[in-house]
Design a protein with these regions (language model features):
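Short linear motifs at protein or domain termini
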Residues: 1-21, 28, 145-147
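Generic C-terminal helix-cap and adjacent flexible tail
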Residues: 137-147
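Conserved amphipathic alpha-helical segments that form helical-bundle/coiled-coil interaction surfaces
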Residues: 15-95, 105-113, 123-136
């Protein structure tokens, strides 16, 4: 794990770089391979994250579940082994951005879920990339403000 890494700001940035490399492609694979059950699960988790965000309640676990469901829907045997890296980064991102990406998270999660449901790999890839870029931009702004 990443428990012993002292520089949390560097860790957040590095995890985000790795997620930007991996997750858009994972979303694309999920759009190609997701079956009806996968799509139901992804859509339900998207709804749950949105509901929690709108109530200003902790959405971290459901957010983790959403990204994990997408990874499993890729049907790639290696991807689930990457999920712990993605999962460990989400609480750090939520903590770092302090809920400032409420609308962006709702919109991009919905776009990712819709693209996967439509079996549109390019749209899913773009939506996931946009989701992560919003996070990166917000984290960079927070880093700048704290310097």
């Amino acid at each position: 794990g990443f428990t012993f890494i002292v520089d949390k700001k560097k860790l957040v940035q590095d995890l985000l770089e790795v997620r930007i490399l991996l997750e858009p492609s994972i979303a694309s694979m999920a759009a190609v391979h997701a079956d009806d059950e996968d799509i139901k699960k992804i859509t339900a988790l998207c709804d749950e994250v949105e509901d929690l965000l709108k109530k200003h309640e902790d959405h971290t676990q459901k957010d983790i579940d959403f990204h994990a469901a997408i990874a499993l829907s890729s049907k790639n045997v290696v991807v689930p082994r990457l999920v712990p890296v993605i999962n460990s980064s989400i609480p750090l991102f939520v903590e770092t951005t302090r809920g400032t990406l409420l609308e962006e998270t709702i919109e991009t999660h919905r776009e990712i879920a819709d693209a996967i449901a439509a079996h549109d790999p390019l749209r899913a890839q773009d939506a996931m990339y946009l989701h992560l870029v919003y996070n990166r931009k917000q984290i960079q702004m927070i880093k700048k403000d704290s310097e």
